[in-house]
UniProtKB/Swiss-Prot annotation:
Molecular function via GO: ADP transmembrane transporter activity; ATP transmembrane transporter activity
Family: Belongs to the mitochondrial carrier (TC 2.A.29) family.
Record GO biological process: ADP transport; ATP transport; mitochondrial ADP transmembrane transport; mitochondrial ATP transmembrane transport
Cellular component terms (Gene Ontology): mitochondrial inner membrane; mitochondrion
Catalyzed reactions: Mg(2+)(out) + phosphate(in) + ATP(out) = Mg(2+)(in) + phosphate(out) + ATP(in); ADP(out) + phosphate(in) + H(+)(out) = ADP(in) + phosphate(out) + H(+)(in)
Entry keyword annotation includes Transmembrane helix: yes
InterPro entries (UniProt xref): Mit_carrier (IPR002067), Mitochondrial_sb/sol_carrier (IPR018108), Mt_carrier_dom_sf (IPR023395)
Record keywords: Membrane, Mitochondrion, Mitochondrion inner membrane, Repeat, Transmembrane, Transmembrane helix, Transport
Solcar repeats: 90-176, 184-269, 280-367
Task of the protein: Calcium-independent ATP-Mg/Pi exchanger that catalyzes the electroneutral exchange of Mg-ATP or free ADP against an hydrogenphosphate and participates in the net transport of adenine nucleotides across the mitochondria inner membrane.
PROSITE patterns, sorted: SOLCAR
This protein's name: Mitochondrial carrier protein SCaMC-3L
Length: 370
């Protein structure tokens, strides 16, 4: 049978009608469902990079959060992001003063543990084992109760240059990497932080040597800081002020890597726990940074012990020490456990040092009106 004359036209009109109906349905149809939101991101208020405490990242900018803090574990003084982002000079000095005061009070409060750590690192051995209580008793018997704070004066004194150098060097590195505005990416923040720590440790290494000698001094050995420096220069020369520099620099690597790895692990744990990511408490931030810093200290502790032994070598044996020689001597006489002498007071002082510095820093900010 042939097609009817009007059939092609009817077919075209039907197709056009069908398209119009489909178009109408598409316009009236509800929008497609949105993809599920990404998992909540870590926001502890303090993204931590070796030597610094950063505010969390949001759209490549650093947000100022109330939980940002200074943290002094007795080994590393963290610089909070609010100090790094301040433009007003008056406010900047207030932040720096708050951080310096927090570090001074923290180190003074934990000075007996710090001296016990150095004492055990230098004098404890298999044949002359010294535990924490025994070390404290020996120090009190030799010099009285006040002797527990020997070396604390210079330990507090070096806070100001250490803090200022870290701040200044990081600012220069940040401006070099990404200009005056914006925040550098993670890798460049890590590099900037490590450079600042390395430079600050280079400049204050003589103060570290003086601190070790003054901490270990016997009653009447030195009249004070200047007399200690004079005797070292006269008997051992200027090179003695940089003893322990190499293990100190090498210790940055395991410290920083372990510190960041543990912090990232805590970050993942916090995200997977499904808790409120928007506003964790200051205690969570403080605990995370303290734990990661403690693990970093444990990873670099053998190098820290070698550094201390090299700095105190004149006090112990009167020879010119090398890193290799000190390490071989420790392993031969005490074994691998000898590389962790003094770890107990080191761990015991982390939590009180961090807590004291946090409380004092916040109190100083309120007092100074910032």
């Amino acid at each position: 049978m042939g097609a009817q004359p009007g059939e092609p036209q009817n077919t075209c009109s039907r197709i056009q009608t069908l398209f119009r109906r489909v178009k109408t349905l598409l316009i009236k149809a509800p929008p497609p469902p949105q993809p599920p939101p990404p998992p909540p991101s870590w926001n502890p208020g303090c993204t931590h990079v070796y030597g610094y405490a950063f505010g969390h990242m949001h759209d490549n900018n650093l947000e100022h959060l109330p939980s940002q803090q200074v943290l002094d574990t007795g080994e590393q003084l963290m610089v909070p992001v609010e100090v790094l982002e301040v433009d007003n000079k008056e406010a900047l000095w207030k932040f720096l003063l708050s951080g310096a005061m927090a570090g001074a009070v923290s180190r003074t409060g934990t000075a007996p543990l710090d001296r016990a750590k150095v004492y055990m690192q230098v004098y404890s051995s298999k044949t002359n084992f010294t535990n924490l209580l025994g070390g404290l008793q020996s120090m009190v018997q030799e010099g009285g109760f006040r002797s527990l704070w020997r070396g604390n004066g210079i330990n507090v004194l070096k806070i100001a240059p250490e803090y200022a150098i870290k701040f200044s060097v990081f600012e220069q590195c940040k401006n070099y990497f990404c200009g005056i505005q914006g925040s550098p990416p993670f890798q460049e923040r890590l590099l900037a932080g490590s450079l600042a720590v390395a430079i600050s440790q280079t400049l204050i290494n003589p103060m570290e040597v003086l601190k070790t000698r003054l901490t270990l001094r016997r009653t009447g050995q030195y009249k004070g800081l200047l007399d200690c420096a004079r005797q070292i220069l006269q008997r051992e020369g200027t090179r003695a002020l940089y003893r322990g520099y190499l293990p100190n620099m090498l210790g940055i690597i395991p410290y920083a890597c372990t510190d960041l790895a543990v912090y990232e692990m805590l970050q993942c744990f916090w995200v997977k726990s499904g808790r409120d990511m928007g506003d964790p408490s200051g205690l969570v931030s403080l605990s995370s940074v303290t734990l990661s810093t403690t693990c970093g200290q444990m990873a670099s502790y053998p190098l820290t012990l070698v550094r201390t032994r090299m700095q105190a070598q004149d006090t112990v044996e009167g020879s010119n020490p090398t890193m290799r020689g000190v390490l071989q001597r420790i392993l031969a006489q005490q074994g691998w456990l000898g590389l962790y002498r003094g770890m107990t007071p080191t761990l015991l002082k982390v939590l009180p040092a961090g807590g004291i510095s946090y409380v004092v820093y916040e109190a100083m900010k309120k007092t100074l009106g910032i």
